[in-house]
Amino acid sequence: MGMKKNRPRRGSLAFSPRKRAKKLVPKIRSWPADKKVGLQAFPVYKAGTTHALLIENNPKSPNNGQEVFTPVTVLETPDVTVAGIRLYEKTTKGLKALTEVWAEQLDGDLGRKLTLAKKEEKKTADALDAVVEKATEVRAIVHTNPKTTGIPKKKPEVVEIRIGGSSVAERLAYAKEILGKTLAIGDVFEAGEIIDTLAITKGKGFQGSVKRWGIKVQFGKHQRKGVGRHTGSIGPWRPRRVMWTVPLPGQMGFHQRTEYNKRILKLGSEGAEITPKGGFLNYGAVKNGYVVVKGTVQGPAKRLVVLRGSVRAAEDKFGLPEVAYISTESKQGN
């Protein structure tokens, strides 16, 4: 096809305004229509990337049955704690919270993040049964346990996760069962499953138009004057304002992004078997369970990533390929 003659920018305006995300915890705006009872997402931490050799299982591929080099991402999966349950009612203005119940015993580090209610102020499970007829959604309030990882912090992240199921009563029964307990990645996902990843991307700071939007670098007179890396025209004389569509300098990176249809290649409980020699760059050793995802995952090392059941997965024609080898060689450049 070749290059377009008119190319004012290389970035999509659908993501505007490109400003910094408010929180490091991504906001989950949609959920899969899954009737399986259980959590529909799981928060993890990005450790780093490596490569693997997979046995190609596509019969139409010229590499069928052969080893194929594939980049993979390793995510550490410390157990999460279910701290509370929240019920929602569907109204004309969106979801409305009906009530919430918290576990009797809460981790002391959770008080670094939230103002915890006193014991005599906490609601019991009877408060859930009183409004269950109005409820349309059941969600679990879970928090991570970063102190069990190599990340130097104690304050946990709090994530609200929808509970799937065929009926509200079935979801609520499961929520009561897991309240106050810890869950592992194996309780939510399994190897071969297709998932989505939600995270805040790596921040780049304030960048110019060429790097931020991919506009053309001007040569000739503009370059000789030292103004080659700027927008040639930012608009007409009238109307006397600059349109929001003009590619201008500004914040680049640190945005929430969702990547769809990633495949889980492997789940494990021993982090030592996946940690490369010398540890992952800017992360260190994996101390808990882990999950290996095919391809890349947005964000730098130590970034919180939410794994969600796929909301737009196509038919899985070939299934999980055989993993022949996962590299644990040093990433230090030695």
From Swiss-Prot:
Transmembrane segments: none annotated. Residues 1-21 are annotated as: Disordered. PROSITE patterns: RIBOSOMAL_L3. One of the primary rRNA binding proteins, it binds directly near the 3'-end of the 23S rRNA, where it nucleates assembly of the 50S subunit. Belongs to the universal ribosomal protein uL3 family. HAMAP family: Ribosomal_uL3_A (MF_01325_A). GO terms for cellular component: cytosolic large ribosomal subunit. It comes from the Archaea. This is Large ribosomal subunit protein uL3. NCBIfam families: L3_arch, PRK04231.1. GO terms for molecular function: rRNA binding; structural constituent of ribosome. Keywords: Ribonucleoprotein, Ribosomal protein, RNA-binding, rRNA-binding. It comes from Methanococcus maripaludis (strain C5 / ATCC BAA-1333). The keyword rRNA-binding applies. Gene3D superfamilies: 3.30.1430.10, Ribosomal protein L3, domain 3, Translation factors.
